[in-house]
């Protein structure tokens, strides 16, 4: 049986990094505001566990993005398919990622993809390969997490 999964990424500012990756991937930022409001009203969530971003309440220190074509719970906003969850952590990133995302350009569109990602806040680190593995760029997201565009 195949398992459902999500990739969890440690951050300093979960909502901001979710915004970047939603734009970079063409994903939707999840909106848990209805669930947050319900939990607040029922006294099951303390006010200090809630923050607001772009006019919507969310769980403090967390944000997620999901593929726009994948199923999701319309009340909670939580995706049931391809999903990235960002969680705030107190320590800064200090070493290279052991896991990273590769984003793929349309044929012939790598330069345009890299330029678009840079316009969203990514930083180009280096260009790699021209051999059998192909041609790609290593970039950093706004918090310094490595990813590749190929």
Predicted feature locations:
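Vicinal oxygen chelate
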Residues: 2-9, 19, 23-25, 31-93, ...
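Helix N-cap motif at beta-to-alpha junctions
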Residues: 13-14, 106-109
């Amino acid at each position: 049986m195949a398992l459902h999964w999500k990739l969890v990424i440690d951050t300093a500012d979960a909502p901001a990094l979710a915004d970047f990756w939603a734009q970079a991937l063409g994903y939707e930022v999840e909106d848990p505001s209805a669930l947050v409001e319900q939990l607040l009203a029922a006294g099951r969530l303390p006010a200090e566990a809630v923050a607001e971003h772009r006019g919507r309440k969310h769980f403090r220190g967390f944000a997620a993005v999901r593929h726009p074509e994948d199923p999701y719970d319309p009340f909670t906003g939580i995706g049931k398919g391809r999903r990235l969850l960002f969680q705030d952590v107190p320590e800064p990133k200090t070493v290279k990622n052991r896991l990273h995302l590769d984003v793929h350009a349309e044929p012939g569109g790598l330069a345009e993809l890299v330029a678009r990602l840079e316009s969203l806040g990514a930083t180009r680190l280096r260009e790699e390969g021209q051999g059998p593995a192909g041609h790609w760029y290593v970039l950093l997201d706004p918090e310094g997490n490595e990813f590749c565009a190929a």
